[in-house]
Regions:
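A short helix->loop->beta-strand "cap" motif at the edges of active sites that frequently abuts
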Residues: 141-143, 204-208, 394-398, 485
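Glycine-rich, charge-decorated loop segments at or immediately adjacent to ligand/cofactor-binding or catalytic sites
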Residues: 1, 159, 220, 260, ...
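Polysaccharide-binding and catalytic clefts of secreted carbohydrate-active enzymes
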Residues: 3-193, 199
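Short, well-ordered secondary-structure micro-motifs within conserved domains or adaptor modules
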Residues: 366-379
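Hydrophobic targeting/anchoring helices
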Residues: 146-149, 154-342, 432-448, 453-455, ...
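A short, well-structured beta->alpha microelement
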Residues: 344-366
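A conserved amphipathic helix/loop scaffold
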Residues: 376-526
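Short, solvent-exposed turn/loop segments enriched in Gly/Ser/Thr/Pro and often Arg
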Residues: 1, 46-55, 149-153, 213-216, ...
């Protein structure tokens, strides 16, 4: 915004925080009107891009506060219900204001207000994006509207991608190597591009997405993990994005920014537009795409039957737990997405076309059978989703629960101490969980080699299920038949263990469990 409008705009050529007041909304609506009506008939206009990497906002702003109070009233109906859930003493919803403890609580801080706050963050972001898109469409219904989230892996709980189908025509995302791909080791950045692409494709309307920002050149000071992609990097990442279904790849940036942060960094070309190894490989890929346009214009990824489920509920619990800086080093705020990516890489390496879907967005009720759904270290599972999982399995599908899946509900209530809501589904319950300082060897029935699991040694007791795996002290895995389908429950953290030794053992497990699905693919690796 203009510097004269607000103190926060002074000295800032770029500002991508969400709206902070009703007064700003009025001015923003007028800005959108003038901008859209001026450019909507310009032949150079292809799309409207709503904010750059939107996520941040002032939690104490008048607009955020008002929306928070409305959100709490809609969720709890009475202030007494809020007080009971949050351990608070409000007398009116108007007293609810942002509390920093929701994000940086001490060791014993109650989880419910923290989880609710992160849910509100998600919904407030969605509200802002919808407001902007609706105002654009008041004046232009011909051009597509898109957006580009940042840090899709780490911030998937904030981006309600399934809900965005009602807002955007196509999705995008920033995929900068020095920022968004660094959750995986350097030699696995291609898998990171594929993973972000699958998350976008799984949620986007009819799977439409772009790689809307791809790092084009060198970092000096502007990368979390500074690097310079070479021609082979760009070729791998671009073809990976296209192979995952991306309809467009946009560099940040083609040429260099002249002044300020990022000046002299990120460019595909040289400082005076000289050709580089990066620009040459880009030109060659463009020629290939043009030469084979008949194929690429209609090509799309094959729709597989194996799906990894992403749980925003789990990510919110880990955000509540992580600030304590206690416990196992690896089970931090990114533990769930890291475990999911271990499975993703293992499946990709064997040529399995695997989808990634949000837990609540997966089509549990589809009449298609023979599907496989994988829950990786999904520690927070709402009770409301479990009956849908049971019907999914009973209809003739398979569910694999690995790691500490189901250890809590979505509000950090431990599920193992009373009635385990997933017991009918998984065929038993966990009786104990013991920490070990080293990897634990477990043997799954039917596999020739042991699997290595991270730190925790689980002990399980079968009810309707049968033992499917053991360690040196007892049963640690169950297989259960429910209706026409089955479940495999391995509460040992084998995906987390694979981060030390590679994904080969995890791939062997996956191959044994999804063999019929692999055989149905038109192509796979031997």
């Amino acid at each position: 915004g203009p510097a004269w409008l607000s103190e926060k705009f002074r000295g800032r050529p770029q500002f991508n925080e969400l709206f902070d007041s009703e007064q700003v909304l009025v001015r923003a609506a007028e800005y959108i009107r003038q901008t859209v009506t001026r450019y909507r008939d310009d032949q150079a206009l292809e799309s409207w891009w709503v904010l750059n990497e939107p996520r941040r906002f002032d939690p104490r702003s008048p607009l955020a506060t008002a929306r928070l109070q409305e959100w709490a009233a809609a969720k709890y109906s009475t202030v007494e219900a809020v007080n009971e859930a949050w351990i608070e003493h409000y007398t009116d919803f108007s007293q609810i204001v942002y509390n920093p403890l929701w994000e940086r609580g001490n060791y014993f801080y109650w989880p419910v207000p923290t989880v609710d706050w992160y849910q509100f963050q998600r919904d407030f972001l969605t509200w802002n994006l919808r407001w902007i898109a609706d105002n654009i469409r008041r004046y232009d219904t011909r051009h597509i509207i898109t957006m580009n989230p940042a840090n899709v892996f780490e911030s998937a709980h904030q981006y309600n991608l399934p809900a965005y189908r009602e807002i955007f025509d196509v999705y995008g995302a920033s995929m900068h190597a020095s920022w968004q791909l660094r959750l995986l080791p350097r030699d696995n950045y291609g898998y990171a591009v594929a993973g972000i692409s699958e998350i976008l494709r799984g949620a986007a309307p009819e799977g439409r997405f772009w790689v809307s920002e791809l790092q084009g050149g060198n970092n000096i000071w502007s990368g979390k993990t500074p690097m310079c992609p070479d021609s082979l990097d760009l070729a791998q990442w671009i073809w990976t994005g296209i192979g995952s279904g991306a309809r467009k790849v946009v560099y940040w940036s083609l040429n260099y920014r002249k002044q300020g942060i990022e000046a002299g960094e990120w460019g595909v070309f040289g400082f005076r537009s000289e050709a580089t190894d990066r620009s040459r490989v880009t030109a060659e890929m463009n020629r290939v795409l043009a030469r084979h346009n008949d194929f690429f214009s209609g090509a799309k990824p094959w729709q597989g039957t194996v799906t990894l489920l992403l749980s925003p509920e789990t990510m919110r619990l880990l955000l509540h737990i992580d600030p304590f800086e206690c416990g196992a080093r690896r089970f931090d705020r990114n533990a769930h997405i890291q475990s999911l990516l271990s499975w993703f890489m293992a499946l990709q390496k064997m040529g399995c076309q695997v989808d990634i879907r949000y837990l609540q967005d997966y089509d549990w009720e589809s009449e298609q059978t023979g599907r496989v759904a994988i829950l990786a270290d999904m520690i927070g599972i709402p009770d409301t989703i479990i009956p849908r999982m049971e019907r999914f399995v009973s209809a003739g599908n398979k569910l694999i629960g690995e790691g500490l899946t189901g250890f809590f509900d979505e509000y950090e209530t431990n599920t193992m101490q009373s009635e385990f809501a997933m017991e009918r589904l998984l065929g038993g319950r966990m009786t104990d969980l013991r920490m070990r300082d080293s990897l634990n060897s477990i043997r799954i029935d039917g596999l020739k080699a042991d699997l290595q699991a991270y730190m925790w040694k689980p002990f399980v007791e079968a009810t309707t299920g049968t033992p499917a795996g053991r360690h040196d002290e007892g049963v640690c895995a169950l297989r259960n038949h429910l209706g026409k389908g089955e479940t495999l429950w391995i509460p040992a953290c084998v995906s987390m263990g694979s981060r030390d030794i590679g994904t080969r053992e995890l791939a062997r497990l996956a191959a044994a469990e999804i063999e019929p699905n692999l055989k149905s693919q038109p192509f796979r690796f031997g």
